[in-house]
From Swiss-Prot:
Species in which this protein is naturally found: Lactococcus lactis subsp. cremoris (strain SK11)
Protein name per the record: Thymidylate synthase
Keywords tagged on the record: Cytoplasm, Methyltransferase, Nucleotide biosynthesis, Transferase
Binding-site residues, (6R)-5,10-methylene-5,6,7,8-tetrahydrofolate: D181, A278
Gene encoding the protein: thyA
SUPFAM superfamilies named among the record's database cross-references: Thymidylate synthase/dCMP hydroxymethylase
Record bears the keyword Thylakoid: no
Family from the record: Belongs to the thymidylate synthase family. Bacterial-type ThyA subfamily.
């Protein structure tokens, strides 16, 4: 069993055994019912990417390619226009959060563009990678007041470098997430930001180091317990999947494409499970 599968099962068991139920939840299911969840707070895990510890479970298929396309919509295209996500990348699951003007509001990619977040990050890392201020922050109250829309879940990422004994510079990343759907989105979000970490490392010809993942509220929705128990019963694949970015060192961040990523040795357990999303 991979490290990621161990973490996946431990998190599920922890929520089932020690979690508490939310009250007066904001999200709703498609039938209009309130979508409460069982949750724990303060979940933290470290993945040593240098050692091949990638945060992807093999207990069910995870749509990594779509996740990476969504990431590029946010950080390369820098827009919240759903037409770009749907027509350029063929990713359609954000439609439920459309606010009426064809966007998801002044959120995510629109915030990245408004504050030139990626430009400032790359400039800061180029000037002084050892500076402890290389941060992405999508939690902008001004944007929340400007339009309606879902508030960012994965909202802050911090980057640090280390020069190891081999003389190479390694890029570490820390993702902070306010809320995470353990069964549906946990490994999607983690792998998205590992991909972002890899893109930035390639831009500077650095190695990829460690990925630190903190979730403030880690939950299982109250209509997902059957799926949770099924996942706990499954035997994980013996393969150890890893994500590879097949571009030369020094490739510009904005020149990297979704097809440059390759998920190697990924043989997830099937069949896929179905989930009714909370909106």
């Amino acid at each position: 069993m991979t490290y990621a599968d161990q973490v996946f099962k431990q998190n599920i068991q922890n929520i089932l055994d020690n979690g508490v139920f939310s009250e007066n939840a904001r999200p709703k299911y498609k039938d209009g019912q309130m979508a409460n969840s069982k949750y724990v707070t303060g979940s933290f895990v470290t993945y040593d990417l240098q050692k091949g510890e990638f945060p992807i479970t093999t207990l069910r298929p995870i749509p990594i390619k779509s996740a990476i396309k969504e990431l590029m919509w946010i950080y390369q295209d820098q827009t919240s226009e759903l037409s770009v996500l749907e027509e350029k990348y063929g990713v359609k699951y954000w439609g439920e959060w459309r606010i009426g003007d064809g966007t998801i509001g002044q959120r995510y990619g629109a915030t990245v563009k408004k504050y030139n977040i990626i430009g400032k990050l790359l400039e800061g890392l180029a000037k002084n990678p050892w500076n402890r201020r290389n941060i992405i922050n999508l939690w902008q109250y001004e944007d929340f007041e400007e339009t309606e829309g879902l508030l960012p879940c994965a909202f802050q990422t911090m980057f640090d470098v280390r020069r190891e004994k081999d003389g190479q510079i390694y890029l570490d990343a820390t993702l902070i997430q306010r809320s995470n759907d353990m069964l549906v989105a946990h490994h999607i979000n983690a792998m998205q930001y590992v991909a972002l970490q890899m893109m930035i490392a390639k831009h500077f010809s650095w190695k990829v180091g460690k990925f630190f993942y903190f979730v403030n509220n880690l939950h299982i929705y109250d209509n997902q317990f059957e799926q949770a128990n099924e996942l706990m019963k499954r035997t994980a694949s013996e393969k150890e999947p890893r994500l590879v970015l097949n571009v030369p060192d020094g490739t510009n961040f904005f020149d990297i494409k979704p097809e440059d990523f390759e998920l190697v040795d990924y043989e997830p357990v099937k069949p896929q499970l179905k989930f009714d999303l909370a909106i």
